[in-house]
């Protein structure tokens, strides 16, 4: 049997993963009617993708221990017990089927018999084709400086992607789902060798347009109906996680116009804070006259804000606002409503004519 395996028979793959800040980056699940645990989803840019792990792979061994007959929870516990690194022996569906027909039991020794050091290269080569970077440690560090630099060249890469596909015998080959924690419709998994994978569609992509129609904010059912309405062809405009965050910072919805040409500029927090700063709002209030209703509301608000101030504090601030309060006490926002009313009353009293002495009144009327 080992001779058959050595004579051009398909081989399993050994994927060595180093845990990242978000874990290994793959989802494990069991399939109905099948024995064993399968890789359901591999997150882009994760240690799992860089190791060559693919969605649809069947897990055979964990750190050299066969797990084909173990339950889902047993396999999960075994992977967790490995701490910061794990070694997974997997087979893709085609290899699995051919090895079962040959009656070959999948084991890690098969790779050692086939020039162990050299046999670890094919998974890395497959990872390079998928844009994951090299073999283990050195290639994994390559993308990180690019993310830290954030040069204009990198910004040009933050574009939406137009994935055009034709339906195959098993459909398009991707699963759509919605996430409760964030709006939008996302690609949950892409089947290997499917029209979706050939079009460049990737797991975790968010759908923006379906056949040229924007589906932002539409529910899951409407997006599915829009895809089905395309018949045997579909054109999906999608964004990956990083591109999605970039366009959200720019306050712009991605479109096919962004496939080429200039990209929008992100709106910085500094500009927003400057526009909403108290100084800017004060300048705007002083330059533009306020309607009567707004004046009343402002005076009520100032009363509420200064209700905790002591009388001494109000007296100390009064001289600085005498010029504005003498012309119109209602416009003085630094005093309370009660003080403003009192000043208005004093102003009306001060405008009255002085009272005349009774003797002068009698003398005036007697002359008449």
UniProtKB/Swiss-Prot annotation:
Residues 113-157, 253-368 are annotated as: Disordered. It is a peripheral membrane protein. Its main location: cytoplasm. One of its GO terms (cellular component) is filopodium. The keyword Nucleotidyltransferase does not apply. Residues 14-94, 162-242 form the PDZ domain. Homodimer, and heterodimer with NHERF2. Binds the N-termini of EZR, RDX and MSN. Binds the C-termini of PDGFRA, PDGFRB, ADRB2, NOS2 and CFTR. Binds ARHGAP17, EPI64, RACK1, OPRK1, GNAQ, CTNNB1 and PLCB3. Binds PDZK1. Interacts with CLCN3. Binds the C-terminus of PAG1. In resting T-cells, part of a PAG1-NHERF1-MSN complex which is disrupted upon TCR activation. Forms a complex with CFTR and SLC4A7. Forms a complex with SLC4A7 and ATP6V1B1. Interacts with TRPC4 (via the PDZ-binding domain). Directly interacts with HTR4. This is Na(+)/H(+) exchange regulatory cofactor NHE-RF1. It comes from Bos taurus.
């Amino acid at each position: 049997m080992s001779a058959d395996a050595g004579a051009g028979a398909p081989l399993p793959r050994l994927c060595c993963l180093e845990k990242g800040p978000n874990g290994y980056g793959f989802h494990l699940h069991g399939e109905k009617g099948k024995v064993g645990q399968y890789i359901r989803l591999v997150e882009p840019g994760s240690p799992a993708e860089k190791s060559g792990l693919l969605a649809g792979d069947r897990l055979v061994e964990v750190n050299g221990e066969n797990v084909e007959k173990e339950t889902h929870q047993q396999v999960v516990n075994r992977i967790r017990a490995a701490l910061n690194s794990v070694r997974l022996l997997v087979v893709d569906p085609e290899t699995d089927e051919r090895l079962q027909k040959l009656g070959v039991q999948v084991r890690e020794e098969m790779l050692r018999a086939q020039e162990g050091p050299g046999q670890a290269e094919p998974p890395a080569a497959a990872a390079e084709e998928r844009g994951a970077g090299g073999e283990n440690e050195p290639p994994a560090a390559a993308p990180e400086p690019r993310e830290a630099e954030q040069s204009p060249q990198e910004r040009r890469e933050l574009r939406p992607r137009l994935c055009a596909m034709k339906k195959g015998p098993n459909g398009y080959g991707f699963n759509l789902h919605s996430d409760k924690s964030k709006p939008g419709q996302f690609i949950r998994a892409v089947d290997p060798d499917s029209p979706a994978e050939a079009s460049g569609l990737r797991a975790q992509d968010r759908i923006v347009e379906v056949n040229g129609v924007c589906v932002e904010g539409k529910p899951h059912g409407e997006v599915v109906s829009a895809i089905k309405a395309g018949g045997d062809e579909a054109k999906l405009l999608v964004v990956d996680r990083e591109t999605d965050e970039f366009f959200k910072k720019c306050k712009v919805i991605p479109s096919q116009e962004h496939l080429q040409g200039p990209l929008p500029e992100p709106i910085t927090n500094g500009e927003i804070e400057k526009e909403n700063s108290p100084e800017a709002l004060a300048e705007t209030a002083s330059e533009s006259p306020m309607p009567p209703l707004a004046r009343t509301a402002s005076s009520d608000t100032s009363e509420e804000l200064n209700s905790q101030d002591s009388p001494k504090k109000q007296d100390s601030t009064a001289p600085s606002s005498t010029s504005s309060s003498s012309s119109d006490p209602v416009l003085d926002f630094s005093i309370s409503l009660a003080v403003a009313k009192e000043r208005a009353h004093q102003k009306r009293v001060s405008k009255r004519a002085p009272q005349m002495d009774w003797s002068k009144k009698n003398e005036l009327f007697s002359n008449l």
